[in-house]
Amino acid sequence: MGGDFAPEAAVKGAVMAVDAIGDECRIVLFGDEDRIRAVLKAENCAADRFDIVHTTEVIEMGDHPAKAFQQKTNSSIVVGFGYLAKGLINGFASAGSTGAMMVGSMQAVKPIEGVIRPTISTVAPTVTGGKVLLLDVGLNVDCKPEVLAQYGIIGSIYAQAMLGIRNPRVAVLNIGEEETKGNAQSKAAYELMKESEEFN
């Protein structure tokens, strides 16, 4: 279990989740079993409410993601993605290395056919009480215009399916609203998105 304040923050979050969800699903925790059990005990939560898979390695934030994913095969991220690839779990989340999570999503699980690159998204509130979905928030340093345009399609589908927004409006977040502003990638992505009939 990587990430800031690991494993305490992740285990406490898992306890909150299992309290909210109940027996509807089973949460599997990957990491140092002794440390996980110590946090569960401190939280007055019975360890038998979870499945715990002991791992001995951690992909550190400074590790090269692809190399670490290949070399640290007993890390929580690699083992977790292995469980996901084998169908032993239905979903996998980690607060650890973002780069290793991207490598895992591309190598262990495989993206949906046609998806060029995965993206990280977040939902933020609007001043009117609605929600806005932001994509590409911390994974990619540079994106080709085609990838940014595809993120528009992915975001539109996600907003409809997960946020219940019937006809989401898609835009490129840029340094100004004028079409002539921004870097070359943003302007080219805008042109591709403007011509697309895949989204609003």
Residue ranges, per PLM feature:
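Short glycine/serine/threonine-rich phosphate/pyrophosphate-binding segments
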Residues: 4-11, 74-87, 91-105, 116-120, ...
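Phosphate/nucleotide-donor binding subsite
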Residues: 45-89
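Short, acidic/small-residue loops that bind anionic groups at enzyme active sites
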Residues: 103-138, 195-200
